């Protein structure tokens, strides 16, 4: 029996790329490192661009992931949504539409997607706005039956997360990325990939 091959492309901003992580793994690299490969071959591609909002991601994702995917492999898409739309004054309705367009196109191409919501920062006013945006992304994903990982709610008042941000100029460091990876791994990652969850995770 041939070994399953999954091509896994991830689009997002600098958090996806692990900027500020002393181990240079970020949450995505950590999640992959904890993913068993005895029954599956995973070929991963990080397609990150700094300071991107939903509009930019929706405009570039298909061309970029299309160059990595193959008809001979199982193709998976990770969409690491960002908080940049808050700075660009993009309405929540528009942000929803941008993600919906990505997921609708992915569904038409039989690409299974996982949406990872944006994590909270330290600014209370911004977090209040981000709460609505994160919830909107979750609603769009669930309506289209794609996986969604809520980063906002569990990290909002997490002491270690907030301390890590405070020590790293508002960005996650090693501890913060570890927390993000843990959430991804325990919110459907293995089921989404169709592989058994290791007992030690």
Q: Which stretches of residues belong to each language-model region?
A:
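Catalytic His-Asp segment of secreted/periplasmic serine-dependent ester chemistry enzymes
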Residues: 120-201
């Amino acid at each position: 029996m041939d070994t399953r091959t999954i091509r896994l492309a991830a689009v997002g901003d600098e958090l996806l790329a692990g900027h500020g992580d002393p181990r240079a793994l970020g949450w995505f690299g950590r999640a992959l490192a904890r993913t068993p490969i005895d029954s599956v071959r995973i070929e991963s591609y990080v397609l990150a661009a700094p300071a991107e909002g939903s509009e930019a991601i929706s405009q570039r994702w298909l061309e970029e992931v299309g160059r990595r995917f193959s008809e001979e492999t199982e193709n998976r898409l990770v969409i690491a949504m960002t908080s940049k739309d808050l700075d660009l004054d993009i309405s929540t309705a528009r942000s929803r539409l941008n993600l919906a367009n990505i997921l609708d196109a992915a569904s038409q191409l039989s690409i299974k997607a996982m949406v990872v919501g944006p994590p909270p920062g330290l600014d209370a006013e911004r977090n209040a706005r981000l709460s609505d945006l994160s919830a909107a992304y979750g609603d769009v994903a669930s309506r289209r039956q794609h996986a969604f990982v809520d980063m906002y709610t569990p990290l909002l008042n997490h002491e270690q997360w907030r301390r890590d941000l405070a020590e790293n100029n508002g960005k996650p460091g090693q501890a913060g990325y570890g927390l993000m990876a843990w959430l991804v791994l325990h919110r459907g990652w293995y089921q989404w990939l169709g592989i058994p969850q290791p007992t030690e995770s």
